[in-house]
Amino acid sequence: MKIKTRFAPSPTGYLHVGGARTALYSWLFARHHGGEFVLRIEDTDLERSTPEAIEAIMDGMNWLNLEWDEGPYFQTKRFERYNAVIDEMLEAGTAYKCYCSKERLEQLREEQMAKGEKPRYDGRCRHSYEHHADDEPCVVRFANPQDGSVIFDDQIRGPIEFSNQELDDLIIRRTDGSPTYNFCVVVDDWDMEITHVIRGEDHINNTPRQINILKALNAPVPMYAHVSMINGDDGKKLSKRHGAVSVMQYRDDGYLPEALLNYLVRLGWSSGDQEIFTREEMIKLFSLGAVSKSASAFNTDKLLWLNHHYINTLAPEYVATHLQWHIEQENIDTRNGPQLAELVKLLGERCKTLKEMAQSCRYFYEDFSEFDADAAKKHLRPVARQPLEVVRDKLSAITDWSAENVHHAIQATADELEVGMGKVGMPLRVAVTGAGQSPALDVTVHAIGKTRSIERINKALGFIAERESQQ
């Protein structure tokens, strides 16, 4: 049997991390078994579905590199197929037309609730032989079995049973002729030959209804696996108040897709004590049996740790392709300065996100108008004038511009003046970067470049001279 899974989001908003984890688990299961992964857009909610949401879902899937083998399919383009199946069910007697008014259904609901009963349709039209005009408004309901139970072996949770007496005669076509969500899902899974449905636990109550419809159609019933919800670190359901929940927001915040995928796969699944997984390792090791039944707690600090790990372990050239977007957001012109791959090597240890990296790299490419006030007050004092003049002259004398030779020039300055490296290094750092913090000074000065470094030292000397004149 060829394994076939699907990810079927509703385009009523962005792709959130819960949906992304479900997509990842479905994708991994298909890849692990050499099967196929289908992308299906469940856009039957015409009022809430938007083109922007569809684009956001596609963007998120593409950014995570969760490629699909089929699709994207759109339910709104398959209404003719759904209605044809409903008509066949009406002919076969597994569905019926219901003419009950909204007022009657509301009264029925109130009476049942007053008695402490679960609100459900009482089947009045199921057993009615009243004649109705062809144009009289009606819905179509599925004739759910009235006895027995539905049992399915959830691949994560084990056997789950629902009594058919607890299930309603589900509306499968509205009065306007449009098919309903639960019915469309069934026909899609049947037509697309889905073997395993992996989805959130909020769909558990839909499963027995969908199984009964599949059986009424004599269609194969897929295996089901319901993934537990994701909570915030406070134990409450993950929401915007816990920070970013949109996949693309994590991109915007400077996370690498590898970090988010690694974090999401471990958010409810484990393989021993291993924390770091390549994509290939995920595919090789993933199984539904190792997915937890319990809710998972989202921990942003752990995700940040993973992101820092991947910034420093993935190829700098690859990380640079993602950094480029953030550089563009900061409007930094990188034509005159180090290659972005070199920048990743320079700032990787200091920066936990690519956004932070982009926001702290401007001095490598563009001149700054003023020095950081606190750093200048502390380090660009008259006592720093001589070390800056000497190190400037030694840097100017370098013919082979390298980080090693820059280091020798700084060391030689300290030796000549018989002062510690800090007496030379700190004023030099503020002079060339405008700030009091940077990566190692030799590689920083080397990356900034000879001409630009000397110009900035002269600017710092001018700042010191002006400061002296005011004393």
Curated annotation (Swiss-Prot):
Keywords, ordered alphabetically = Aminoacyl-tRNA synthetase, ATP-binding, Cytoplasm, Ligase, Metal-binding, Nucleotide-binding, Protein biosynthesis, Zinc
What InterPro entries does this protein map onto? aa-tRNA-synth_I_cd-bd, aa-tRNA-synth_I_codon-bd_sub2, aa-tRNA-synth_I_CS, aa_tRNA-synth_I_cd-bd_sf, Glu-tRNA-ligase_bac/mito, Glu/Gln-tRNA-synth, Glu/Gln-tRNA-synth_Ib_cat-dom, GluQ/Sye
CC terms in the record's Gene Ontology section: cytosol
**Motif 'KMSKS' region per UniProt: ranges:** 237-241
Using the UniProt record, give the first listed, main subcellular location: cytoplasm
Catalytic reactions on record = tRNA(Glu) + L-glutamate + ATP = L-glutamyl-tRNA(Glu) + AMP + diphosphate
| GO molecular function list | ATP binding; glutamate-tRNA ligase activity; tRNA binding; zinc ion binding
> Where is this gene product found?
Cytoplasm
Motif 'HIGH' region: positions:
9-19
User: Example GO biological process term?
Assistant: glutamyl-tRNA aminoacylation
The superkingdom of the source organism is Bacteria
Cross-referenced SUPFAM superfamilies: An anticodon-binding domain of class I aminoacyl-tRNA synthetases (SSF48163), Nucleotidylyl transferase (SSF52374)
Positions binding Zn(2+) in this chain are 98, 100, 125, 127
PROSITE patterns registered for this protein in UniProt: AA_TRNA_LIGASE_I
The cofactor(s) it depends on are:
Zn(2+)
User: What EC identifiers does the entry list?
Assistant: 6.1.1.17
Residues reported in the UniProt entry to bind ATP: 240
Q: Which PANTHER family does the record match to this protein?
A: GLUTAMATE--TRNA LIGASE, GLUTAMATE--TRNA LIGASE, MITOCHONDRIAL-RELATED
Q: Describe the protein's quaternary organization and the partners it interacts with.
A: Monomer.
- State what this protein does: Catalyzes the attachment of glutamate to tRNA(Glu) in a two-step reaction: glutamate is first activated by ATP to form Glu-AMP and then transferred to the acceptor end of tRNA(Glu).
Q: Please identify the protein, giving its name as recorded.
A: Glutamate--tRNA ligase
Q: Which organism is it from?
A: Salmonella dublin (strain CT_02021853)
